[in-house]
Structure formats: C-alpha cells, structure tokens
Amino acid sequence: MKFQIRKATEGDIDVICELVRELASYEKMSDQVTFTNEIFADSIFNKNHAKALVCESDGRAIGYAIYFYTFSTFLGLGGIYLEDIYVKKEFRNQGIGKAFFKFLAQICKDENLKRLEWCCLNWNEPSIKFYESMGAKNQSLEWRTYRLDGENLEKLVNL
C-alpha cells in the first residue's frame, strides 16, 4: 500500500477532528472530547499551540499526528512532544506509525531538537511493544506526570 505523510493544512481540520474522535473512542475517553472543529483549527493554525501531520492513501486521510515543541533546561535545547498518533485500524501494521515517527525524527534532526517524547496508556500493549521496538525507553519509572485542569486550575488562579 502506498501512503504519504505530510504537514496538515486548514482543509484537513474536519478529517483530523473525526480521527481524534475515533482515537478517543479507542482509548475509552470519548466523554472527554469537548472541542469544536473551529476551536481545534484555531489552536493549530492560528494560535500555533500545536502542529499536525496527516497520512493519506489514495487521497483519503487514514491517520494523523499532533505534536508541539518542548524545551529541556538541562540540554538547553528543544524537543518535540507527540500528543497524539493515530492510524485507522484497518491500516495498522503497514509501516504508517513508523513513518510518522521517522517524519518527526527528521524534524528533530533538521531543527537540532534532541528529544522526541510522548505518553501511552498503560493498557495499550500493542503500542508499547511498537514504541519499544524502535528503541524508546519508558520514562514513567523515574518521572510522574501531573495535571491541573478545570476547577483546580481555576482555584490556583484565584489564590
């Protein structure tokens, strides 16, 4: 099967949002999806909060990746955080996931970025095996991820 990874354009927003909803369903998190396509487009294409990639085959979007830039104070250099990577079920195990990572690794190389990081749900064994097969190391043994959102974030603002 032939496919192409490319940077997303504003014309891709509806299909990206559809794929995000598919990912949320797969991850059993559909109830957490609250965005509108307009908000999503504004965040990616106007506010530059993140960047998007699309994988196409025969003119049809079959996967996407969302990433943003990070910074390591210890290295004094930037990196990429991969927020989402998703390939439609019927197109998995055909090299698309690896192609997304290769595309992102090339961005890292071209821009002298020293890290490519992401997280994965602990029950997602197929993805864990895939990531480890590429040489990725599990960081959760040394680091914990924390989040403030919603009411707790608002409380902090109002302290």
Q: Where are the model-predicted features located?
A:
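A conserved beta-strand-loop-helix scaffold within acyl/acetyltransferase catalytic domains
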Residues: 67-74
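A short helix-loop-beta-strand connector motif used in the catalytic cores of GNAT acetyltransferases and
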Residues: 42-54
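Conserved N-terminal entry element of GNAT/NAT acetyltransferase domains
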Residues: 1-11, 153-159
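Conserved beta-hairpin
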Residues: 51-63
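Conserved GNAT acetyl-CoA-binding A-motif
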Residues: 109-119
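Conserved GNAT-fold acetyl-CoA-binding loop/helix
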Residues: 17-43
